[in-house]
Design a protein with these regions (language model features):
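Catalytic phosphate/nucleotide-handling subdomain of diverse soluble enzymes
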Residues: 223-265, 274, 280, 343-390
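Phosphate/pyrophosphate-binding loops at sites that engage ATP/ADP/AMP, CoA/4′-phosphopantetheine
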Residues: 75-92, 198-203, 325-337
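Short beta-strand-loop/turn "lid" adjacent to the catalytic site in phosphate-handling enzymes
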Residues: 76-128, 147-149, 155-166
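N-terminal glycine/serine-rich phosphate-binding loop of ATP-dependent small-molecule kinases
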Residues: 1-104
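Internal helix-turn-beta structural module
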Residues: 311, 315-337, 346-430
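Glycine-rich beta-strand-to-loop/alpha-helix junction loops that act as flexible
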Residues: 10-11, 97-99, 214-216, 339-348
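Adenine-nucleotide phosphate-binding core of ATP-dependent small-molecule kinases
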Residues: 267-271, 280, 284-332
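Glycine-rich phosphate-binding loop of actin/hexokinase-like ATP-binding domains
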Residues: 159-260
Length: 430
């Protein structure tokens, strides 16, 4: 029987793969990533478990996610010190992260029908599903004996009530076209819920959290009794908080004024305005890069910002996050077990955590400065940075792990059940 599970996380400019043992719990064997696909030369990071991380700039031309995935797979298969994954026959399953799953509430195994359904969603999320679907197509063609399982960032939020996910537009059109709030970062939120509930020694179904996944893409989720009841992202990941290149929430008509001569907005002036143009502007030409010229938040979140624009970008993000924290605190009736920071920025930026915590002191939020500045150790999944026990919600840092979440499993008689908290996919051990 095949011995490993391959987890794949594909973005527009990067592809990450991780091999895990096919056991309960799974153990990482090797991790490899190529970034900079859209800004050559591409960069490789590769590490076998227990060994030193290898990094290099590649001379190979890797211009698509498929190119990067094929390179990574060959690199791992050809590695003499990685005997566990020498060929396709060593793979039990391939687990793919797909951002937008539409109405799928659970993970699914890819077949002709499910693939057709996901391809139909490309019109709904052309900027977000493309890379993942390209790699799924490649796997079906070149690794046909290995089943592919898809896990959706949107599925975790299927528990949101109708009044949260419904947009006040013509419902005949909305339902025919799937126009509603979906929410994203669900794979991360599922991992965080499971990890934080265990840390707090509470059942997931009795856990109330406000969780911030703050990275180059940023969102917030409110979890009540172990279920998502609202989140900042919407029909697409563009809604909600600003990001490195995303605008976040704006007046919907702004984009038409943005692309027309000032003061000359008219039906004639906007007739050539296309959805693809608007998405390009708001997804890739906005956010803190538009304000500061950099996507690196570490250059923005500093005690003495290099410019007023950098300070403005930081203040905007803080302001927008505070709005959601207040909203979600009320939605939980003040019964909040923890305020959780996660994502690359949430985990690393002590200044952002301190600033937000100070501005939330009216909610009983307080942090230990030393613990906050130190941050979590590499092997510390959840770290408590609260100050003063029992005076308000705990303040935690959770180092989320979407790759591992794709392969978390539990034994179930003759089956192994992959489960992200999004619903199970039963996988035969035969």
């Amino acid at each position: 029987m095949a011995k490993t599970v391959l987890a794949v996380n594909a973005g527009s400019s990067s592809v990450k793969i991780t091999f895990y043992t096919f056991e309960n719990p799974p153990k990482a064997i090797a991790d490899a990533q190529i970034s900079g696909i859209t800004a050559p030369p591409p960069a490789l990071k590769f590490q076998r478990t227990g060994s030193t991380k290898h990094q290099e700039k590649l001379q190979e031309k890797l211009s698509t996610p498929q190119d990067a995935f094929k390179y990574l797979l060959k690199r791992c298969f050809d590695d003499p010190e990685l005997s566990e994954v020498a060929s396709e026959s060593d793979l039990a399953y391939i687990c793919h992260r797909v951002v937008h799953g539409g109405d799928y509430q659970d993970s699914v195994e890819i077949n002709d029908d499910t693939m057709h359904h996901l391809e139909a969603l490309e019109d709904l999320a052309p900027l977000h599903n493309f890379s993942a679907l390209e790699i799924i197509r490649l796997c079906r063609k070149e690794l046909p004996s290995v089943p592919s399982i898809t896990f959706f960032d949107s599925a975790f939020h299927h528990t949101m009530p109708d009044y949260v996910r419904t947009y006040p537009i013509d419902q005949t059109i909305a339902k025919a076209n799937g126009l509603r709030k979906y929410g994203f970062h669900g794979i991360s939120y599922s991992f965080i819920l499971r990890s934080v509930a265990e840390f707090l020694q509470k059942p997931q179904e009795k856990t109330n959290l406000i969780v911030m996944h703050i990275g180059s893409g940023a969102s917030i989720c409110v979890i009540k009794e172990g279920k998502s009841i609202d989140t900042s992202m919407g029909l697409t990941p563009l809604a909600g908080l600003p990001g490195a290149t995303r605008s976040g929430d704006i007046d919907p008509s702004l984009v038409f004024h943005y692309t027309s001569d000032a003061g000359k907005l008219s039906p004639t002036a906007t007739k050539e305005m296309h959805i693809s143009t608007a998405e390009e502007i708001l997804n890739k030409k906005s956010g803190w890069k538009a304000l500061t010229g950099t996507t690196d938040f570490a250059e923005i979140a500093v005690e003495s910002p290099p410019s007023e624009a950098h300070k403005l970008a930081f203040d905007i993000l803080v302001d927008r996050i505070l709005g959601y924290i207040g909203n979600y605190y009320v939605k939980l009736g003040g019964e909040v077990d923890a305020l959780v920071f996660a994502g690359g920025i949430g985990e690393k930026s002590a200044l952002l955590r301190r600033t937000l915590s100070e501005k939330c002191k009216s909610l009983g939020i307080a942090i230990d400065s030393e613990a906050n500045d130190k941050g979590p150790e590499d092997d510390e999944t959840v770290k408590d940075i609260s100050k003063g026990a029992g005076k308000g919600p705990r303040v935690l840092i959770c180092q989320t792990n979407e790759q591992f979440a794709l392969t978390q499993a539990r034994d179930n008689d003759e089956w192994l059940t992959c489960n992200l908290g999004l619903g199970p996919v039963k996988i035969s051990l035969d």
